[in-house]
Amino acid sequence: MCRMSFKKETPLANAAFWAARRGNLALLKLLLNSGRVDVDCRDSHGTTLLMVAAYAGHIDCVRELVLQGADINLQRESGTTALFFAAQQGHNDVVRFLFGFGASTEFRTKDGGTALLAASQYGHMQVVETLLKHGANIHDQLYDGATALFLAAQGGYLDVIRLLLASGAKVNQPRQDGTAPLWIASQMGHSEVVRVMLLRGADRDAARNDGTTALLKAANKGYNDVIKELLKFSPTLGILKNGTSALHAAVLSGNIKTVALLLEAGADPSLRNKANELPAELTKNERILRLLRSKEGPRKS
């Protein structure tokens, strides 16, 4: 989240920023009408009165500033705009108002952030809908490659995810490190998100650049509800490109329920990882060892 500074040049400007932040419309009007406060005055980081009012969701102050000539599309040093802040904080009434006066969805922050990415990251479904209706690019990405869908998946915002998918978001679009939306949803334990993405065509075996898959990550974390959803789509249970398996990860995590789920799905306890280790060699947990050995017998016979 972008932080705001409130260091001002003059006491009157300081008062104006306080009024915008607190939603004190009467004081804000008084200061603006005095002619001694520029409607586009900035703090040391380029923050404007409009940005502050938009961030706080004070629609009356936003309206007053715009009607007094505030530049809607000014950017802070970080690249953020009033629209970005309103979207980030979920103030849909402010977002709609700003669009009525020419707010642009094209501006980016220093890390590539846009209003759509911010709204998706924080789960503001109505704001996402408004932004898309006003031309926001569904394929916006942070400079690390994260899309709106990726950020919504990371947060587990199912309503936003459904909206983005219905609007044409690419379900398998990864970040630069290869992390796909399904992978991040699995890592965070969002089983309903995982289910929806799989039904919409997410690659069950999509791997990050380091070779880990969604199943391996869920096994490592012990997210059994996620694992159950992934297993419905028959993901790879064998040794992955990174030289280990989901079963190895589950054994290391010490979650016997996870180990049982994978074994019941057909994971092979006789497979060795890149260090030539069997899953059973990675634990001293007697219950897990008994479970592994109970599955080894039939395979060796």
Curated annotation (Swiss-Prot):
Keyword Signal in annotation: no
Record Gene3D superfamilies: Ankyrin repeat-containing domain
Ranges of the ANK repeats in the UniProt entry: 11-41, 45-74, 78-107, 111-140, 144-173, 177-206, 210-239, 242-271
PROSITE patterns reported in the protein's UniProt record: ANK_REP_REGION, ANK_REPEAT
SUPFAM superfamilies: Ankyrin repeat (SSF48403)
SMART domains: ANK (SM00248)
One Pfam family here: Ank_4
Repeat in keyword set: yes
InterPro entries: Ankyrin_rpt (IPR002110), Ankyrin_rpt-contain_sf (IPR036770), Dendritic_Spine_Reg/Scaffold (IPR050889)
Keywords: ANK repeat, Repeat
Protein name: Ankyrin repeat domain-containing protein 29
Originating organism: Homo sapiens (Human)
